[in-house]
Amino acid sequence: MAEFVEADNAEAIIARIETKSRKIESLLKQYKHVEALKTALEGSPPKTRDERCKSANWIVVHRALMAIKDIDGMLNALDVEYYDILMKYLYRGLSTGDRPTCDQCLKIHEKLTERAGLGCILRCLTDTINTV
């Protein structure tokens, strides 16, 4: 069974996310959108059940996702190791029902699926332990 982060560690996780958020804002201001997305995806708290942590990290990832204009360029620059976690966040974005977010997530989903294949989708949907 996977180890889950206890609620008392949630404050430490949120503090790390806040630090990460400031770094992402700086990268976005420098038009380093891919670096911002990588930073947002790194250290995502998938093993916590604390919704505050998940929501805080989603906000950071969402900000970076919405800044991406060149999806092919982003995927060329993004390491393969990021594909599965990115797919999870795309589904989280689609679940919001927000039109601009869904549009962006669908565009990225299409290109990511072309690049990573259906296995990426299957791993994302069947992994019920590491959730975003």
From Swiss-Prot:
Please give the chief subcellular localization of this protein.
cytoplasm
The listed locations are:
Cytoplasm, Cytoskeleton; Cell projection
Briefly explain the null phenotype: Distorted trichomes and altered epidermal cell types.
Q: Where are the N-acetylalanine residues found in this chain?
A: A2
Enumerate the GO terms in the molecular function aspect.
Answer: actin binding
Its cellular-component GO annotations read: Arp2/3 protein complex; cell projection; cytoplasm
Q: From which domain of life does this come?
A: Eukaryota
Organ and tissue specificity: Expressed at low levels in all tissues with a relatively highest expression in inflorescences.
Any one GO biological process = actin cytoskeleton organization
Keywords on this record? Answer: Acetylation, Actin-binding, Cell projection, Cytoplasm, Cytoskeleton
Matching entries from Pfam families are given as: P16-Arc (PF04699)
Q: Which InterPro entries match?
A: ARPC5, ARPC5_sf
Tell me the function of this protein. Functions as a component of the Arp2/3 complex which is involved in regulation of actin polymerization and together with an activating nucleation-promoting factor (NPF) mediates the formation of branched actin networks. Arp2/3 complex plays a critical role in the control of cell morphogenesis via the modulation of cell polarity development.
The entry's family comment says:
Belongs to the ARPC5 family.
Spell out the subunit comment: Component of the Arp2/3 complex composed of ARP2, ARP3, ARPC1/p41-ARC, ARPC2/p34-ARC, ARPC3/p21-ARC, ARPC4/p20-ARC and ARPC5/p16-ARC.
PANTHER family in the cross-refs: ARP2/3 COMPLEX 16 KD SUBUNIT P16-ARC
Protein name (database record): Actin-related protein 2/3 complex subunit 5A
Write down the species: Arabidopsis thaliana
From the broadest rank down, the organism's phylogenetic lineage runs: Eukaryota, Viridiplantae, Streptophyta, Embryophyta, Tracheophyta
